[in-house]
Amino acid sequence: MRIVFCGTSSFAVPSLELLASEFEIALVITQPDKPAGRGQKLTPPPVKQKALELNLNISQPEKISFLKEELLNIKPDIMIVVAYGQIIPKSMLEIPTFKSLNLHGSVLPKYRGAAPIQRALMQGEKETGNTVILMSSKMDEGDILSVESIPIEQEDNYEKLSNKLSIKGAKLLKDTILSWVSGSIKPIPQNHQEATYAMPILKEELRICFKTSAFSIHNKIRGVYPNAYGVSGDRNIKILKTNIVEKDLNLKPGELFYDGKSLFVGTGDLPLEILEIMSLKGKRVSGKEFAMGYLNQVKKFY
């Protein structure tokens, strides 16, 4: 089985690794290297790093349409797309003998789009999963070949949940490929009336508005982990982990309070206990450590 694999983010890495151990990967298509970090150093995407480690052929086109002729020459049996980041023309999706499959990190038709895991957490969902679809010209609207659900745990944040889904999704994808090629599964159309959408996370969404509910703030912190922040004066301080407290501490939104054991912040309704936060020196610390070291400098978030 000759596979062309399209993927970019760390979510796609377990799928590439597992498929490479079972099948022939004729080509890995991934996004171009991009500047990253404080030094803005040109950095290869996670899929490229894994493909280099596996000694696979790699292509990084600015537009995937540039590779149509190469795809025709490769004559793949199937194309697999996992967190790639570009719209692939229908004419290319239909080149492989068994067409093109996509692993998506939600139970479709819920959370179609670029940020399904983040948005599910931000909405406080109790369950999510993976879906493998037969790709169509419209994003995430293809017929369903397989689906698997998992519970969202209280301790899950974006990093933890994405990691779990990527590992489970790799196995689901491998099993689905074998079933699809053997003809033992049939595509099931999605119910488009039940579709919801997971739009990309905007920079302005990372800032916490403490006038909103404790539920929405707590789930934002989980969903965009580790990037949600509160503003105090000229400081942006990342809050990494919280717990909703079912008692009235009479705190105004953004007001900080330390009771000698725990650090709390006021919201639009219930207080939040801050369990983990970035110190003013950029180090991860507990709420208690932050209170003992910085509460004289940071008394309120705005």
From Swiss-Prot:
Chain positions recorded as (6S)-5,6,7,8-tetrahydrofolate binding sites: S106, V107, L108, P109
InterPro entries for this protein: Fmt (IPR005794), Formyl_trans_C (IPR005793), Formyl_transf_N (IPR002376), Formyl_transf_N_sf (IPR036477), Formyl_transferase-like_C_sf (IPR011034), Met-tRNA-FMT_C (IPR044135), Met-tRNA-FMT_N (IPR041711)
Function: Attaches a formyl group to the free amino group of methionyl-tRNA(fMet). The formyl group appears to play a dual role in the initiator identity of N-formylmethionyl-tRNA by promoting its recognition by IF2 and preventing the misappropriation of this tRNA by the elongation apparatus.
MF GO annotations: methionyl-tRNA formyltransferase activity
KW Coiled coil (keyword) present: no
Keywords, ordered alphabetically: Protein biosynthesis, Transferase
EC number(s) reported in the record: 2.1.2.9
HAMAP family to which the protein is assigned, alphabetical: Formyl_trans (MF_00182)
Catalytic activities: L-methionyl-tRNA(fMet) + (6R)-10-formyltetrahydrofolate = N-formyl-L-methionyl-tRNA(fMet) + (6S)-5,6,7,8-tetrahydrofolate + H(+)
A GO-annotated cellular component: cytosol
Keyword Nucleotide-binding: no
Top-level division of the source organism's lineage: Bacteria
EC top class named in words: transferase
Name used for this protein in its record: Methionyl-tRNA formyltransferase
Classification lineage: Bacteria, Pseudomonadati, Aquificota, Aquificia, Aquificales
Organism, scientific name: Hydrogenobaculum sp. (strain Y04AAS1)
Family, similarity comment: Belongs to the Fmt family.
Membrane-crossing residue ranges in chain numbering: none
PANTHER family: METHIONYL-TRNA FORMYLTRANSFERASE, METHIONYL-TRNA FORMYLTRANSFERASE, MITOCHONDRIAL
